[in-house]
């Protein structure tokens, strides 16, 4: 597995943890779902924060690179969970964001 694939996989798991941690409260507040869903939401957000610490880069650089993968995972969530068809604009935005992530994540180490 290449370094880029490892980084992208860790970012994808991190993004999923963040999305679940934010989606569950949304279900409680907007969808009238049970309040106990806030417990797994909090655990998911704690997992998200911990996963961010596994990256070797400085925190700001990690967050910047992570943003590209987050966009792609959020669009997959939009399609799979929300059932919304993606547009070519969604795809183009995801490609650009992932390209930015690769530039930031794979820069030469000083």
Curated annotation (Swiss-Prot):
Assigned GO CC terms: plasma membrane
Q: What is its main location?
A: membrane
User: Which keywords describe this protein according to UniProt?
Assistant: Cell inner membrane, Cell membrane, Membrane, Transmembrane, Transmembrane helix
Per UniProt, what is the membrane topology? Multi-pass membrane protein
One Pfam family linked to the record: UPF0060
Task: List all disulphide bridges recorded for this chain.
Answer: none
Q: Where in the cell is it found?
A: Cell inner membrane
Spans traversing the lipid bilayer: 9-29, 34-54, 66-86, 88-108
Matching SUPFAM superfamilies, A to Z? Multidrug resistance efflux transporter EmrE
Family, similarity comment:
Belongs to the UPF0060 family.
* Protein's recorded name: UPF0060 membrane protein BamMC406_1172
Native organism is: Burkholderia ambifaria (strain MC40-6)
């Amino acid at each position: 597995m290449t370094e880029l694939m490892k980084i992208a996989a860790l970012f994808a798991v991190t993004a999923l943890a963040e999305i679940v941690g934010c989606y569950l409260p949304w279900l409680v507040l907007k969808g009238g779902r049970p309040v106990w869903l806030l417990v797994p939401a909090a655990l998911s957000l704690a997992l998200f924060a911990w996963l961010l610490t596994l990256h070797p880069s400085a925190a700001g650089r990690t967050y910047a690179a992570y943003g590209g993968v987050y966009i792609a995972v959020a669009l997959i969530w939009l399609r799979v969970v929300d059932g919304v068809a993606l547009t070519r604009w969604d795809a183009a935005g995801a490609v650009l964001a992932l390209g930015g992530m690769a530039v930031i994540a794979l820069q030469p180490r000083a």
